[in-house]
């Protein structure tokens, strides 16, 4: 079976939905580093059709979630795990890989919002 990795931010997870839930006074303190706001990754909604799409892929591929977390936001690591448990369930959370070097993961396919 072929392996497919699916990114979280802006693929499974609607990053702007989390930003919208942060009070303006907190946002102002982080400027262009909103991914460093503690707890932001726990505030995000799924992208439209993301859950159904992930479930479809999981039926047809050896599917993993491959994401990165900001170095300066330690809660992001646990928040991402909790997000996967909440929206994708127990089986998916055991298939979560957090890495700053996605290129080190051997894979047939990668669904990611970044092109490089």
Model segments located where?
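Conserved Lys-Pro-Asp/Glu-containing loop-to-beta segment of HAD-superfamily phosphomonoesterases
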Residues: 3, 93-116
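Short, solvent-exposed loop/turn segments at secondary-structure junctions
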Residues: 11-13, 18-19, 69-72, 102-104, ...
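Alpha-helix C-terminal capping segments
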Residues: 19-22, 54-60, 104-105
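Short, acidic loop-to-helix structural element flanking the phosphoryl-transfer center
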Residues: 31-65, 74-78
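A short, structured active-site edge motif that brings together acidic residues
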Residues: 66-72, 77, 81-104
């Amino acid at each position: 079976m072929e392996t497919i990795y699916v990114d979280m931010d802006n693929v499974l997870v609607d990053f702007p939905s989390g930003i919208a839930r942060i009070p303006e006074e907190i946002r102002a303190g982080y400027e262009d580093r909103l991914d460093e706001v503690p707890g932001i990754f726990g505030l995000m909604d799924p992208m439209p059709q993301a859950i159904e799409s992930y479930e479809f892929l999981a039926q047809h591929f050896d599917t993993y979630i491959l994401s990165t977390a900001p170095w300066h936001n330690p809660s992001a690591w646990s928040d991402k795990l909790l997000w996967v448990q909440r929206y994708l369930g127990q089986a998916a959370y055991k298939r979560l890989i957090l890495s700053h070097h996605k290129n080190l993961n051997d894979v047939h396919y990668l669904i990611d919002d970044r092109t490089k």
